[in-house]
């Protein structure tokens, strides 16, 4: 029943918001595979994310990442780079001991002016980075050691940390997650005794 729910969720009609979050999660997954600890800001704060979709930390360095999943015929203009630059500056001020780097990742291309602005502002840019398929089920152990899996429509999904250890992984299907000894996350109910 949970696999059917996941399949229905994957095949539903998606809003622009859903498409953006899906891309942020994909980029976050790729970074986690490279050993980064990823915080999903855009998915949890929405429009209040200040242009920071992801924070990815590894070896004392934090990447402040803005993701844009746009149609190929669209072009990214400089205002998006300026927003990221300002957001990275605020982050650096608020976290003075952290070495940080602004990174802009998109499925399309930047205008020539936007490229020059990125270079001037020392923003790393990844253009034409397509959305790919990846395992959507997050599996981890809770504070009591219970092995739990989370589906992308679960309330806490974007707060679940997946790291490279035996108690944490991604799975393609609910059957795979259950075969690894994980159970479905319970729905959270406030004031439950």
What are these regions (language model features)?
Residues 124-193:
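Mature, structured domains enriched in cysteine- and short glycine motifs
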Residues 1-4, 70-94, 131-155:
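Short, composition-biased local secondary-structure segments
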Residues 1-42:
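Acidic-basic catalytic patches of nuclease active cores, encompassing PD-(D/E)XK
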Residues 38-59:
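Active-site metal-binding core of divalent-cation-utilizing nuclease and nuclease-like domains
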Residues 37-45, 181-188:
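Short, well-structured beta-strand/strand-turn elements
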Residues 59-62, 67-127:
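Catalytic cores of nucleic-acid endonucleases
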């Amino acid at each position: 029943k949970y696999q059917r729910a996941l399949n229905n969720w994957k095949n539903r009609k998606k809003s622009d918001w859903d498409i953006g979050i899906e891309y942020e999660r994909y980029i976050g997954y790729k970074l986690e595979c490279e050993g980064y600890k990823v915080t999903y800001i855009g998915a949890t704060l929405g429009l209040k994310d200040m242009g920071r979709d992801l924070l990815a930390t590894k070896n004392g360095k934090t990447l402040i990442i803005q993701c844009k999943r746009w149609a190929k015929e669209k072009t990214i203009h400089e205002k998006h780079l300026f927003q990221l630059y300002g957001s990275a500056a605020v982050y650096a001020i608020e976290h003075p001991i952290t070495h940080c780097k602004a990174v802009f990742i998109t499925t399309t291309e930047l205008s020539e002016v936007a490229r020059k602005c990125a270079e001037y502002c020392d923003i790393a840019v990844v253009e034409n980075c397509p959305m790919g398929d990846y395992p959507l089920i997050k599996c981890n152990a809770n504070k009591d050691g219970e092995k739990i899996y989370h589906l992308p429509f679960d309330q806490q999904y974007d707060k679940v940390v997946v790291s490279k250890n035996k108690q944490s992984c991604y799975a393609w299907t609910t059957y795979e997650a259950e075969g690894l000894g994980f159970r479905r996350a319970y729905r959270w109910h406030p004031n439950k005794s």
